[in-house]
């Protein structure tokens, strides 16, 4: 096709090569003819006439219209995108216009004649279902010297993003901006300029015919400013939080002992606050559900949308299935542990860690028993639980059963004494009730046995004639230990009297045969101790052998009195009152395990322990064992019970002495027929 005048626009065969091929449809709108032509004809090309090629892709319709050129001017800025005009590979374009694209050198020489008017109206309507995008841009037209400045509005419409990417000989879609004057053509398309912010939508552009402040007209459009987010934790300074007791709300001081229940976040200042404060969960109904029927967890995915987060958020449902509820209930049951003192499988309230060994205690009573057995000193008042910062702070000290108890003031001491007296009175009253019940039962048995006497005497005819009347006088004291008979009773009556003596405890026991008093040497003690012997040893506390010339063994080692003392981690020294040395067997024994121990133990067996080389390690390991701690608790408990029983017996003896003055002698007279 021949060349036309410079004022017209010819579409030649080289146009697809210069502008690109097979990606976007454009409608070229003629601005006007500077040589007198009134308007350019409208050229329409059908979509169906252009459907040819190797891949069979569809091309869009191209419209060429005429519009009035704008009068305003602006710096030259063009779009950096790769716009490709659709064209069929086998058909030629028809028309009387040709697009002349000059080189960069020619544009630089004709800079004064180039129109400075450009309108950047880059509006993208992106749909989520992947439909077409429409991008409208306005480009300038470069004319020859002496001609008027022209503006060509190019309307580009892309079929889809996937179609433009599948075309060959076409660069990737780049929505950035570049200067047309500095652009180059390579293989029918613009030079590719990759920008790190090229994916950001440029819909928020500046108004028409207005220069962006602070940005050069020949530089790419500045990317949107990035927002800097700071966490609220960094913006606000951290404040030191006060730790308070969950029950009494008193602040905990530095160095104060705090108590915490297992599985709870609450802290307490004393065991009193810990026991009084209770948060028990409401019991849940247990649903028996098969694991196969348990619903599976579902995850909800939040799509990204317009958020700047790089990955979608995933979160699972918070509701658990009935099967999982039952599993959690089973775990809570399994969380129960066995108490070190009472051996009950229950919830644990106290945990004491001694030399990396944790001892679990279920109640305050067990904790106090453990503390008394191991000589633990508390830094708080025994009555109110007030914190005592130093040893000198607790001036009021009360010694009970060999243990020192600290109090914050004299009022707490008086309250504690009153509480002990009240408990002692309750114990005495219960013991009196038990003894009175036993005495009444013995009296009923005595009445019943006397009523049987007439029946027994009828069986003996010889005695009937001789004996007309039997008189039985019985003198009863508080313990009902003496029964006097004024007449000779038949053998059946004597048998009843023997039974009565057995019930009243007058029959000698087997324990009286075994000597109750034992030597202080544990090597001479029998293997099995009687109850009386054990009680005697607990009451009297066997002494430790001191100031003795301990013999040496074959290796030249011997026992030393330094083993009687234990040095704690904080430097304090405590006495091992349970360690006894046997002079007869030249070995050591554990008093607690010897009296209450079960099973095999070096410090419990008949020969004891005489490994002087490793004795220090053996003793430290033994006193931390669970068996030794349990036996020590049993020892201290029995000792306190024996003291209490002695007090009760002494009080009863005083009562008997008072009532003995007004004693009543009962005479029972039986008439035998």
Swiss-Prot record:
Matching InterPro entries: TRASH_dom (IPR011017), Znf_MYM (IPR010507), ZnF_MYMT-QRICH1 (IPR051284), Znf_TTF (IPR006580)
Pfam family, one: zf-FCS
GO molecular function annotation: zinc ion binding
MYM-type zinc-finger residues: 266-300, 312-352, 359-394, 405-432
Any one GO biological process: negative regulation of transcription by RNA polymerase II
Cross-link Glycyl lysine isopeptide (Lys-Gly) (interchain with G-Cter in SUMO2) mapped to chain: 92, 167, 226, 456, 463, 552
Listed Polar residues bias regions: 190-212
Entry keyword Transmembrane: no
Protein name: Zinc finger MYM-type protein 5
Provenance organism: Bos taurus (Bovine)
């Amino acid at each position: 096709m021949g060349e036309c005048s410079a004022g017209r626009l010819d579409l030649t065969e080289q146009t697809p090569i210069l502008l690109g091929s097979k990606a976007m449809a454009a409608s070229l709108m003629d601005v006007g003819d500077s040589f007198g032509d009134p308007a350019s004809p409208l050229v329409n090309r059908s979509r169906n006439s252009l459907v040819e090629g190797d891949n069979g892709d569809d091309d869009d319709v191209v419209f060429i219209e005429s519009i009035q050129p704008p009068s305003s001017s602006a710096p030259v800025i063009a779009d950096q995108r790769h716009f490709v005009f659709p064209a069929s590979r086998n058909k030629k374009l028809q028309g009387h216009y040709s697009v002349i694209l000059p080189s960069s050198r020619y544009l630089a020489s004709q800079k004064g004649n180039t129109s400075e008017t450009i309108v950047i109206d880059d509006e993208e309507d992106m749909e989520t279902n992947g439909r077409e995008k429409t991008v409208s841009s306005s480009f300038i037209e470069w004319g020859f010297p002496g001609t008027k400045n022209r503006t060509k509005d190019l309307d580009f419409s892309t079929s889809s993003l996937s179609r433009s990417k599948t075309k060959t000989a076409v660069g990737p879609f780049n929505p950035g901006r570049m200067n047309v004057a500095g652009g180059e053509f390579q293989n029918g398309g613009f030079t590719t300029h990759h920008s790190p912010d090229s994916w950001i939508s440029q819909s928020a552009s500046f108004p028409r015919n207005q220069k962006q402040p602070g940005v050069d007209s020949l530089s790419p459009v500045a990317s949107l400013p990035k927002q800097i987010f700071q966490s609220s934790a960094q913006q606000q300074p951290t404040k030191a939080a006060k730790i308070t007791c969950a029950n009494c709300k008193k602040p905990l001081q530095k160095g104060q002992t705090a108590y915490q229940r297992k599985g709870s976040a609450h802290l307490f200042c004393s065991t009193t606050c810990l026991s009084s404060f209770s948060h028990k969960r409401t019991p849940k109904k247990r649903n028996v559900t098969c694991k196969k029927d348990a619903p599976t967890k579902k995850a909800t995915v939040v799509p990204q949308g317009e958020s700047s987060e790089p990955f979608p958020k995933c979160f699972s449902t918070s509701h658990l299935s009935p099967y999982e509820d039952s599993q959690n209930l089973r775990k809570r049951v399994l969380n129960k542990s066995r108490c070190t003192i009472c051996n009950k499988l229950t919830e644990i309230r106290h945990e004491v860690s001694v030399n990396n060994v944790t001892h679990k205690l279920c109640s305050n009573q067990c904790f106090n028993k453990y503390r008394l057995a191991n000589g633990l000193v508390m830094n708080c008042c025994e009555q109110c639980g007030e914190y005592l910062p130093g040893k000198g702070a607790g001036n009021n000290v009360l010694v009970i059963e060999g243990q020192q108890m600290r109090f914050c003031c004299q009022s707490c001491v008086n309250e504690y004494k009153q509480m002990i007296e009240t408990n002692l009175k309750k114990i005495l009253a219960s013991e009196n009730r038990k003894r009175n019940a036993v005495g009444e039962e013995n009296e009923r048995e005595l009445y019943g046995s006397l009523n049987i006497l007439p029946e027994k005497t009828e069986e003996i005819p010889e005695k009937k004639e001789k004996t007309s009347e039997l008189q039985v006088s019985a003198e009863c004291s508080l313990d009902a230990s003496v029964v006097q008979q004024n007449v000779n009773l038949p053998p059946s009556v004597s048998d009843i009297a023997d039974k009565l003596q057995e019930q009243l405890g007058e029959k000698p026991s087997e324990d009286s045969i075994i000597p109750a008093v034992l030597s202080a040497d544990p090597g001479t003690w029998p293997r099995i101790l009687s109850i009386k012997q054990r009680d005697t040893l607990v009451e009297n506390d066997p002494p430790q052998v001191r100031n003795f010339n301990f013999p040496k063994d074959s290796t030249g080692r011997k026992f030393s009195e330094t083993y009687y003392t234990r040095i704690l981690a904080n430097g304090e020294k405590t006495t091992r009152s349970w360690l006894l040395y046997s002079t007869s067997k030249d070995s050591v024994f554990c008093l607690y395990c010897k009296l209450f121990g079960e099973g095999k133990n070096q410090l419990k067996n008949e020969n004891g322990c005489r490994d002087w080389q490793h004795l220090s390690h053996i003793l430290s390991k033994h006193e931390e064992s669970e068996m030794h701690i349990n036996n020590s608790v049993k020892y201290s408990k029995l000792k306190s019970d024996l003291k209490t029983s002695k007090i009760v017996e002494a009080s009863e003896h005083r009562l008997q002495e008072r009532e003995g003055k007004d004693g009543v002698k009962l005479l029972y007279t039986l008439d035998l027929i």
